[in-house]
Amino acid sequence: MCATWPSGLRTEFMKSQHQDPIYSQISQVKDAVSEVLEHAKKLGATAAEAAMSSTSGLSVSTRMGEVETIEFNQDGGLGISVYVGNNKGSASTADLNPKTLRSVVEKAIDIAKFTSDDPCNGIADKELLEFSPKDLDLFHPWDVSPEQGIDLCHAAEQAALNADERIVNSDGASFSSHQGLRVYGNSHGLIAGYPRTRHSISTMVIGKEGEHMQRDSAYTISRDQAGLKDAASVGLEAAAETLAKLNSQKLGTMKVPVIFRADIANSLFGHLVSAIGGGALYRKSSFLLDSLGTQVFSKTDRMSVV
């Protein structure tokens, strides 16, 4: 299927693919963060930390072979926390011009004047910081056109619809390819940044057998285009997940070993990570409050990558 889209949007997107190298942008953002921190110091902050990020990219969605949306987006923002003694003030903005950034710092300082003194406030100790962070290989830009994105959506959706006659409808397919950067700095002299990309394909379909209907989805996501699953295989996986739900049966009460799928298991461990997070413990909102040294999982539990 051949798809068309507004020439103005296409021109805007293609221009974005040939902007200054992202590493040059990171250098400029580092300078901006440094200026923000210096301004906070001049206004009386005893410590400060700031993060600035930006993201741009393409998103496409289709449904039943028709293009629903084609979007090019470009977003950015800065957040800063300042500390005046043990008083903390925070502010943020999506407007990154220098005048606005200075104003945001001033607002954060003003907020700090009205917050409670808290001895736990402050930035991380200098000796805990990594001043030479490793390159985690997060940046793999993809010069992909909207037409390619549309074709990938169609391939995923059509593969799902053709997989089985019980797949009767689609909730659509989507494709996205984004790149961006993040820079963090604080008053200990740390200013570091990195570029990042994220590409994804997904689809959701509806299955029917008798009077029973179910829906499910599948997706693939990767920093690197080469790490994405084939679009058709994403569609087949969505169909298989949907069909597996049809005529599902409830289990009786029993005590048995359970193997959780990866997409479910990570949420279970997510609850543990949230419960032992410093913020939850500080607010006394964790079920593991005052549980240091307590055995939480069975000694026979183990995590395996399969």
Predicted feature locations:
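Active-site bordering "gate/hinge" segments
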Residues: P6-V306
